[in-house]
């Protein structure tokens, strides 16, 4: 368990660092209020987690240390949206359509509502991204 936590932590560090770096680079070349950095990072994260799980599953290494490092660690540090996307796809592929709809709806609506609640709980005067 400790080894797994360290592996996830290492992957998360590099994923988070890359997220910050890419976000800054994208921010420097885009204008306006649209959150391009977040969208690009989230979409890249979805591609990365799909590639990683596809690769490791094809080789029968879905539970390997490398899989843990790159998926839960790196992709998790890069973006949790990639995990949400992968889990949603799993629900679709296994025919759990009601669970899929519920999961997506609750995640999106609940996420927005809880973000708003967080701003309100902190007494934030506006809903601005730092």
Predicted feature descriptions by range:
Residues 1-130:
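Membrane-interface helix-loop junctions in multi-pass transporters/channels
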């Amino acid at each position: 368990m400790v080894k797994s936590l360290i592996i996830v932590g290492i992957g998360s560090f590099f994923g988070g660092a890359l997220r910050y770096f890419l976000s800054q680079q994208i921010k420097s070349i885009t204008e306006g209020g649209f959150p391009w950095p977040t969208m690009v990072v989230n979409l890249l994260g979805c591609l990365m987690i799909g590639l990683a799980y596809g690769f490791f599953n094809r080789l029968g290494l879905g539970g390997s240390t490398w899989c843990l490092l790159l998926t839960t660690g790196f992709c998790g540090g890069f973006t949790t949206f990639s995990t949400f996307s992968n889990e949603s796809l799993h629900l679709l592929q296994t025919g759990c359509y009601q669970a899929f709809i519920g999961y997506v709806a609750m995640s999106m609506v609940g996420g927005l509502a809880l973000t708003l609640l967080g701003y309100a709980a902190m007494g934030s005067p506006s809903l601005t991204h730092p």
